[in-house]
Each structure stands twice: as structure tokens, then as C-alpha cells.
Amino acid sequence: MSSHTALPVEPLDVLIMGAGVSGIGAAAYLRRNQPNKTFAILESRERMGGTWDLFRYPGIRSDSDLYTFGFDFKPWTKAKSLADAADILEYLSEAIDEHQLAPFIQYQQKVISANWQSDKGLWSVRVEDGRTAQIRTVECRWLFSAGGYYRYDQGFSPRFEGSEQFKGQIIHPQHWPEDLDYTGKRVVVIGSGATAVTLIPAMADKVASITMLQRTPSYIINQPANDGVAAFLRKVLPAQTAYSLTRYKNAKITLAFWGFCQRFPKLSKKLLLWLTRKELPKDYPVDVHFNPPYNPWDQRLCSVPEGDLFKAISAGNADIVTDHIERFTEHGVLLKSGKMLKADIIVTATGLNVQLFGGITLHKDGKPVVLSETLAYKGMMLSGVPNFAFAVGYTNSSWTLKVCLLCDHFCRLLGLMEREGYNVCEPKAPEGVETRPLLDFGAGYVQRALDSMPRQGPREPWVMSMDYFRDVKLLRRGAVTDKCLKFTAVPNAPLHADVQLQQQGSRR
């Protein structure tokens, strides 16, 4: 739906927040596995695609291969393993068409808050129309948050002393101007994460100079743009079979390397630095610019397709400076070492602001839900919060690997509740259970938000697992029920629309 129209018969079975990768995946799973359930997707922006439509900076691409970043039910058939945003948006659009999801998506509809009503067994959800600012209320049995984990309206921008004096442009990649012409300009990119290492080679051929200014280096690895095994399998096997085998292969390799880094941090560090040295000139100071003070996978590794960043540096088209910023000046950035980086454009690729569940406020019978006092159940529900599910992917692998498992498990849960006659499901955390941060991840954007996030426990089902194959056993093959889930049937709760029609017909 390109504009606000009436939702299907309320209360909806499932209300999905967000029409990005996770939201489209959740809706497709419902269509495939629970075709009788009513649902709608509310998207706060004007278009689908989430991250891949929001970010418009040069070179934007995935940093995970599309065989694992894609949906398990929809093969990725293009040659490129690391895809750009346009290809990913095309893939998502195809998924919408193939599952006839377009009529279920309402754009510019922002969920503001949701209140669980125990007496009715329903969520009352307040929604703001982005065009008229009018507020309406939608009722649903399940609320599914698929809006990612960061604020769409604001990236993280630390205050730099003297920034108001700079005469050039200061740009955050999350809000890239469509008309920006950087041809022949001197550019400084502040940051060393995935965005920075994508921007540098994408801009290098047009600028007069471009420098990646980093306070702390990142581990950066060369990744082939194409997957030779996948190409061979596509020639000899049906598309879905070839895709599934490639997906399995890549998930295994990624998890095995992550496990190797966790078990042998010193050895893995030496290996990564050795690989980096092979990509750069012999006299390049790798230990200065590519040697982080933390172990591999304490923060996410950065992938560069066909070593494009290394090639730009080796050709003299890009530069890296590792230093601290003293202040901005009229003409660039003054470093604490005394060095001056002259610039016409400064790009602050300094990260994201974490915001779970789209920033909505959750209530239970009018009382606010304090997220930091909840525990994540199977990485998809919250203790003490009935009929609420969410999709947060892996930090050590492809996001969508986890999302697909969560959506599959969610559909199994809906099926069980329908068969058993339940309409309410609520995880109950054990008394006095030891807790720890939801994400054991050193990235700055995660660390800044830990105090406002749910927690996790010491063991399943309260662990926020980062192991895909462990999660396959738990979420796809394991039992739906356990002693931590409380199921109830709320008397006189509104019935599913199909049941209402059947009963009305029998009365006639």
C-alpha cells in the first residue's frame, strides 16, 4: 500500500513493524507457513528496504555474502557474492512480489507505543500517520518487531571541537546528500568500520585525495566478489539446491573461522595481519594502521570485495592516518600529533545509535515495560511480555541467517497455539537467574546502549546465541514448548476472522 488504507479485519493475528529485510522475511514466512493468519506490515518510511533504502552513500553494499544474507526460501542467483544496495533492493522487491505482500504493507505509518491488555489478550498499538500526524489505534494478538536495531533518523555523531569553524561540508553517511559532488575534492573520512572501508575505494577515483582517519584500526579481510563453488553448483543443480548447499558451506566457514578466532585469539591475529601484509606494499606500516588493540571478532571484521581498499591504498589513491583528533579548523582536521589534514569534505562515519524495537514504548496493562529488567527468550521474546516477538540477527555472521530461524520458530509457535486452543504466550524467567548483557560485542554503538537493552541468561533458552547451527537445533528442530513458556486462553478473546465468519454462517 502506497498510502494509508484500512487494515484487514481487526484484531490482526500479527502486526509487523518494519518493511526491511526482517519484516519482509517475517511476512513471507507467515504467508508460507501460516496462510490463514491475518497480518499487516507498518513501515514508518516511504519505501520498503530498511537499511538498503535509507543509506545512499557511494559504494553501499553488504558485508556478508548474499547466499547467507538472503532468505533461505529464495535463492540468490546473481554472480556477485557481496551485493550492492540496488541488487539487494531488487531481491527484496522480488520477494514481496512472489509472496504477494504489497497489499499488506502500509507506508509512513510509525508505531509509537503498544499496551498489552491482559483482560482482552490483545495489544493496543498507537500508530502515527507520517503525512497527517493523526494517531490511530490498531489491535492485534501478536506484535512482531522487525525494525532492526538502530535509529533511522539519526546516526551517532560525537561532538568535535571547532566543527562550527570548518568551511567545508560535514556529512554523516546515514544522511548522504543526493546532489553531493565530490569530484576533485579533498575528503577526510572519520572512522574505521564497514562504512568507512566501503566509502574509501568507492570515492577514490574521483577525489583529489581521500584519507581514512581512524582512532583505532579494524581487522580488514579480502573477500572474493564471486563465489566459484556457488557458480559451479548453479550449473549442475537446481537453483534452490545449489543455493542451500552454498548457504550451508558459507555459514560453516564463517562460524568455523569465528570459533577459531575465539579459541586462538593470538594465532588468529597473526594470521589476519599476515594476510593484510600480503595485500599491501612491503614497506607499508601494517602494524600502525591494521593492528587493533583488541582480538579478532571482539568487534566485527570488515570485508572488502576483491581487496578494493587495499588496491586503492597501494595505488596511492587513498591514505590511512591513525591518530586522535585535536579539533576541526577552517580548512580541515588538526590531529593531536600536530599533523593537519586539509579537507573540503569531512565524512563522519562514526557509527550508529542503537534503538531496539523502533524506539516504541511498551506497556503491560498500562505499566511501562523496562527493557533492562527483561530477559531475551530464545533471542526472540521477552520475559514477562506476552505475545511479543522480535527479530535481531547475528553480529558474527549474516543477519538473515538468524532472522529466518526466528521467523520459522515463530510460525511453529503460532501453529501450536492454534491447535491447543491458546491465545496468549508469555516467557517466565526463573527467579534469581544470573544475567549478562544481551550482546557480547565490543562495537561502540552496542556498548553505548547496553544499559537500555534486555539482558540474557547463562543457559538456554535465555541465551542470545551467535551459533547458527546450534540455533538450527533449538529453533528449527527443537521443541516449541518448554517449562519457561506459559500458555493461557483468555476467555471471550476476539476470535480469528475466519472463525468469526464460520460461526456467523452456522447461526444462519
UniProtKB/Swiss-Prot annotation:
Its EC number(s): 1.14.13.-
Residues holding NADP(+): 61-63, 192-198, 215-216
Molecular-function annotations in GO: flavin adenine dinucleotide binding; N,N-dimethylaniline monooxygenase activity; NADP binding; oxidoreductase activity, acting on paired donors, with incorporation or reduction of molecular oxygen, NAD(P)H as one donor, and incorporation of one atom of oxygen
Database matches in Gene3D superfamilies: FAD/NAD(P)-binding domain
Domain of life of the native organism: Bacteria
Keywords attached to this entry: FAD, Flavoprotein, Monooxygenase, NADP, Oxidoreductase
Cofactor(s) needed by this chain: FAD
Short name of one Pfam family: NAD_binding_8
Entries under InterPro entries matching the protein: FAD-binding_MO, FAD/NAD-bd_sf, Flavin_mOase-like
Sites where the protein binds FAD: 22, 43, 51-54, 63, 111
Free-text function comment from the UniProt entry: Catalyzes a Baeyer-Villiger oxidation reaction, i.e. the insertion of an oxygen atom into a carbon-carbon bond adjacent to a carbonyl, which converts ketones to esters or lactones using NADPH and/or NADH as an electron donor. Preferentially converts short-chain aliphatic ketones like 2-decanone, 3-decanone and 4-decanone. Some acyclic ketones are converted not only to the alkylacetates, but also methyl- and ethylesters are obtained, indicating insertion of oxygen on both sides of the keto group.
Family: Belongs to the FAD-binding monooxygenase family.
Name of the protein: Baeyer-Villiger monooxygenase
UniProt organism field: Pseudomonas putida (strain ATCC 47054 / DSM 6125 / CFBP 8728 / NCIMB 11950 / KT2440)
